């Protein structure tokens, strides 16, 4: 399978069904069109839910989203076809709607909503593990972005870009990997764990078998950052200004060979990706032997 995204990769390999569950309206951020273009068969959104379950402009709460998804996933599992499902939660995003049972005067609103979101995930996993399909399913948890904690430590705060990535399921041995990674690595890692053949047509890595990255880079609007274990390089494409920091203290430093190496690393990956997209090299086309 030629794959740049898990929905297309898994679907082409074994005729799987791909689903996306979101709390809000499907047109938000053009998600409906984007996800369907990228291989999702079914989209579940605010349009599918009872109006009385909508709690704010971000739609329904996390616990309802998980409860809604469970019977849908069960139905697909009972059909005998494997599925790939993504659930996008939103409760940990202001404005916070905190259920009464999680109101705790000793905690800040941010802490209360995190406790609620964590409980929703925990309850979902407990219920999913009781399902027949839950015993042979890989669960992946990742944040789309972090949250600014305290004062900004640099132009692209570490706390806003350092997010959890957890793979969970039967047969997965407990382990903590201290290595650089990015969301682009999730699809290759899942396909590797499932032993689904694929042609790599993006710059992601299989975190369990490929050589670890020497560094990582990330962007926000017109700002680019790259870092390794000792140095952080930041570039503002709008102003042309460069910033260098020594790690782990994130202390301002002078440009060095290490920062120049990080700059080349980030720019080469960005330019390569742009070239691949512009020349149709990331298009998914199943191999002739795909079922």
Where are these regions (language model features)?
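Solvent-exposed soluble domains appended to multi-pass membrane proteins
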Residues: 1-291
């Amino acid at each position: 399978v030629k794959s740049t995204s898990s929905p297309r990769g898994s679907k082409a390999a074994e005729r799987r069904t791909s689903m996306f569950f979101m709390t809000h309206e499907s047109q938000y951020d053009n998600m409906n069109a984007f996800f369907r273009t990228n291989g999702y068969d079914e989209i579940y959104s605010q349009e599918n839910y009872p109006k009385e379950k909508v709690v704010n402009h971000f739609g329904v709460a996390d616990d309802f989203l998980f409860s809604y998804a469970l019977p849908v996933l069960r139905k697909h599992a009972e059909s005998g076809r494997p599925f790939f499902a993504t659930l996008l939660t939103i409760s940990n995003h202001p404005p916070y709607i905190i259920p009464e049972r999680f109101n705790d005067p000793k905690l800040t609103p941010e802490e209360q909503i995190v406790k609620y979101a964590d409980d929703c995930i925990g309850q979902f996993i407990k219920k999913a593990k009781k399902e027949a399909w839950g015993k042979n399913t890989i669960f992946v948890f990742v944040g789309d972005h972090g949250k600014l904690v305290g004062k900004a430590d640099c132009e692209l705060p570490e706390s806003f870009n350092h997010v959890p990535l957890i793979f969970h399921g039967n047969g997965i041995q407990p382990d903590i990997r201290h290595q650089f990674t990015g969301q682009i690595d999730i699809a290759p890692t899942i396909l590797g764990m499932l032993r689904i053949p694929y042609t790599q047509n993006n710059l992601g890595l299989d975190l369990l078998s490929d050589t670890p990255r020497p560094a990582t880079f990330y962007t926000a609007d017109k700002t680019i950052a790259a870092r390794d274990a000792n140095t952080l390089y930041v570039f503002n494409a709008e102003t042309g200004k460069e910033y260098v920091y020594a790690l782990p203290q994130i202390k301002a430093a002078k440009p060095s060979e290490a920062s120049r190496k990080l700059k080349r690393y980030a720019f080469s990956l960005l330019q390569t990706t742009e070239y691949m997209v512009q020349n149709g090299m990331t298009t998914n086309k199943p191999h002739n032997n795909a079922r």
